[in-house]
């Protein structure tokens, strides 16, 4: 594929044009009076959204240099979304402001590397100041406020706060589409995994189609069980205790399954068999989690344990196990709290070391099942377009609320960045191009609050000057046009979201400013194919 190359000012301006097109489409969504953007889909109905990263992902430009510029800014939105789950619009606006001011100075003769150094130092100081400003989330109401702002709906915010309150900060909050209208919160106590009973004959509650075992023994096996002679010695021991038996294994089949089913139907012995969740190493790890949660051991030949010689003390215990056709819930496992805590910290370390998003997500699920609970928010709406938009907003708001719990909250509405810069720049001692770089950051930090004001029909410059002279934490409530104590009135942002947005924007801005050449694929010139004739004298 032939390439085209642009140098110096031409290269940077091409990138900037692409960035501006993307940023201008994204920034109309910022603030309580931000607008929506409609995204055309090749198949199905269009999507309506005000989520920065969703809009950014859809933008594909024709000009090769502009396309690269847009892709670089997309990376800001994606990275911020990955780290904090929200703040993508703020990150895009900050990147645009930093690049615009930076390129102006480069064109005027400033050294790009000096500017980059100044930007990095200033951003580090502002990030430190944001951390100092951050207040810990102490109440359910504060979680509700930050989630409400992200979702633009106080009912959603309240529901998310309730979900996080129930499952704890390590718990999982998932969002699912529902066939019914409105919002619904479903809580799961204990550990739940997505595997149901192997045979419907295990059902004990015919109305609900559930197998419910009270105070059961739990056999956890990392292999298939098919020969009844392997299982029989253990079945006899469990029968003598009068307790039911839950079996979690790779599979239960053949005469072993038939024996369990026949005894259940006759009322001789109550049991339920479930396939182990996951595959390969992940299955092994999940079975290990279940064993620690229930105080049992995984029966596996890898550790020298055979099924036929298993004793009762190797089985797990729980207050109750509920098995449906699709999922199994273990309620109040009898595991040792110290061992569970050890397993939790081990999984946390694995999450920190993991490079793969997929692995991290799966580890996070395992952590939640061990340390917290699972809350499912079910979303329903009148149309598919509204349903997708609502679901997306709720997912963003859940990430936002979790980020608030993690690193605390700061004043919202772009005020935290502006006020952090006032204090941070008092301590900076830079000269030359580095001082110019720091000044670029100071000007860029006004961009989010100016955009919120603009989207609300106010004059950005006037709002910035007014907020500069207010006490820390006070600023514009763009929804009402009043200047208030933002934290007191619940207009807050998670510190993690604000910090990530600034750091990711500065990272890309530095790359923009130090770019001296851009190499892109040469656009192909495809002449339109000739239209075939109508057939002339041909016989059909």
Swiss-Prot record:
Gene3D superfamilies cross-referenced by the UniProt entry: GroEL, GroEL-like equatorial domain, TCP-1-like chaperonin intermediate domain
Single biological process term from Gene Ontology: protein refolding
Which EC number applies?
A: 5.6.1.7
GO MF term (any one): unfolded protein binding
Give its localization: Cytoplasm
Instruction: Give UniProt keywords alphabetically.
Output: ATP-binding, Chaperone, Cytoplasm, Isomerase, Nucleotide-binding
This protein's record includes keyword Metal-binding: no
Does the entry feature the keyword Coiled coil, yes or no? Answer: no
PROSITE patterns, per database record: CHAPERONINS_CPN60 (PS00296)
SUPFAM superfamilies per the record? GroEL apical domain-like (SSF52029), GroEL equatorial domain-like (SSF48592), GroEL-intermediate domain like (SSF54849)
Origin superkingdom: Bacteria
Q: Which residues bind ATP?
A: 29-32, 86-90, 413, 477-479, 493
| Oligomer and partners | Forms a cylinder of 14 subunits composed of two heptameric rings stacked back-to-back. Interacts with the co-chaperonin GroES.
The protein, known as: Chaperonin GroEL 4
Organism (species): Frankia casuarinae (strain DSM 45818 / CECT 9043 / HFP020203 / CcI3)
- Highest classification ranks of the organism: Bacteria, Bacillati, Actinomycetota, Actinomycetes, Frankiales
